[in-house]
Amino acid sequence: MASADIAAPDFKDAPYWWEAAPPSKAAVPALPDRPEVAIVGAGYCGLSAALELRRHGVGVLVVDAARIGNAASSLNGGMVAGSLKIDHAELARAFGPARATALLEESARCLTFLEELLEREAITCHYLRTGRFVGAHCPSAYAGLASRVETIKRLTGADAWLVPRRRQREEIDTDHYHGGMVAEASGALHPALYHRGLADAVRRAGALVAEETPVDAITRRAGGFTLRTSRGVVEAREVIVATNGYTGAVMPWLRRRLIPLGSYIIATEPLPPETARRLIPRGRMIVDTNRVLSYYRLSPDGTRVLYGGRASFRRATAREAAPRLHAMMVSVWPELARTRVTHAWTGNVAFTFDHVPHMGVHDGVHYAAGCQGSGVAMATYLGYQTALKIAGKSVAPCAFDALPFPTRPTYTGDPWFLPVVGSYYRLRDWLERRLAA
């Protein structure tokens, strides 16, 4: 099928998730003059922080530049991870063995924390503990998964196991991979429904949420901070910046430490039920070991493939990226070559130079960011931990708090180097697959 023919008649440049939970435009409350805590960013992290602060009686104002539900928290793939993407050896080299162990152990707690939050707040978002299949793009990648299995089991207590190529079709109906790994500690949800449910819980708890209220500047003053917004000036005792892949000039120090990267997703037209069940028979979340990775799943109702990946390292619209994603999907399942696309969308994720999420304080301003494209559970958890810290309720320091946070000389937050790095990664992935053919 030619790239021009992949679009279904009802194609939309919008997330599939918005069919069930479009961004809502709530009445914008009058901004309080002096909230105890002002939170910039109403994604998972900011809302989670607001909810926990209200549980401890702290007055909270959450502001966001866009409509609530219009950014990454409702644009992702709805995959819920319970581990970091970096192994213990790399973490130990950067932070020492003890801190490396603490980071991996605490990252595993993110999944349980999210599950408890969903139950406590009665958030209905099609959550399931599905497990995750990681497909090896070449034999050496499969061999490398063995150490990941051992690390996951030893340090997190979660189950994980290798799947040899001869048994691969028990997990995914393709010969595209050279075996893989299943990690039990992983789940799936509807990200827009989760975000809406979290925002509703925050409002019920008594926090003020003001959308379409961008913050132009944060200035330190005696006893707190002044925030200059599009709707007036607000003074707060504490400030949290929770803008992740959309961090701008409001906090230049943080922006210099984050690498925003566009991630793209397509949704197919509905498939015959028996076809969808055969493609991913156990309903796992699927990712691969490519440097330019793909991630995909079935929709919550089991009727469509939602296929995501790094389709472009340059600025591209979702419509422009859709043909590449479609081709990537067909490389896994050639039978879907004539399956059309009904939705395509994109949103920013944020990476860091050390491949680790961070929370901390700079010049008095709290921040949490850099979830490496796996922020559904991690961003929620870091928001919670930041709130505990502000409220003085932390039982123990969070392992992700106050880590050295690197940047690079002359880097200002515009990742000009991504097209070059992306092309290099694509070439290496291609060569490894070619040699394995």
Predicted segments, located by residue:
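Short beta-strand to alpha-helix junction loop
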Residues: 104-111, 135-144, 181-200, 210, ...
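Dinucleotide-binding Rossmann-like beta1-alpha1 core, especially the glycine-rich loop
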Residues: 84-166
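N-terminal Rossmann-like FAD-binding beta1-loop-alpha1 element of flavoenzymes
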Residues: 35-62
